[in-house]
Amino acid sequence: MQRDMLQLTNRSVRTSDDFTQLAPLLINTDGFIEMTRVGWRNPLRHRRSEMQRVSYRLDDEKLVRGYWHTLDRGYDAEPAFQILLEEVEQVEFYVLDTQGEEHKFWPPQLQSGQAADPAAIILRIEIVPFGVVERIWQVPNVNFLGGQLNSNLTGGQPNAPL
C-alpha cells in the first residue's frame, strides 16, 4: 500500500466510451480509493506501461486491493483482486490538500473552479483487535489540479463490484 501511495502520478484513465476520463485520484466515503501509480515492475519485459491503476476498499470485513492489467479501460477490463487484511471494521481515506483542508471526496466538488492539489493521503482503518490505526503518506509533488478543476475528469463509476 505504501508503495502505491508514494508512487501516485497525475494520469487520468480513459474509459471504454471514449468520452469519460477517471481522475488520477478518486476517493469516496465508502472506504474506497482509486489511483494511478508509476513504477509497476516488469522483469519479464512485457509490452505494457509502467503505470498501473490500483484501488483499495473494504469488502466483507476485508481490505482488498484491486489492480488492472491495462491503464485505459476497454469494455472487458476487469480488475484482479488481492485480500490484504481481514477482520477490518472500517476503512476511510481522505486527502489533505496543499491549503490544509481535509477532503472525504476527491476530486473536490467546488463551485468556484479553484482547488488546491493533494499534499497527503490519510488512511484511518479500524482493525480487530487493535482499534483505529492512522497512516499518512505525503504524495509526490505532482501538479494534479493546477488550481483549476478539469471539467473533463469525473468520479464516474471507478470500480466494478466484487
Predicted regions and their residues:
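Extracytoplasmic beta-strand-rich oligomerization domains located immediately C-terminal to a leader/signal peptide
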Residues: 2-74
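Short beta-strand-initiation
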Residues: 20-21, 49-51, 79, 88, ...
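Sterically constrained small-residue positions within well-ordered secondary structures
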Residues: 26, 47, 84, 114, ...
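A short, polar/proline- and glycine-enriched secondary-structure boundary/capping micro-motif
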Residues: 45-47, 73-82, 134-135, 145-148
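Generic detection of short hydrophobic beta-strand segments and adjacent strand-loop junctions
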Residues: 56, 82-84, 135-139
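Structured surface patches comprising rigid loops and adjacent beta-strands/short helices at the edges
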Residues: 82-95
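Short linear sequence signals and composition-biased patches located at protein termini or domain-edge surfaces
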Residues: 92-162
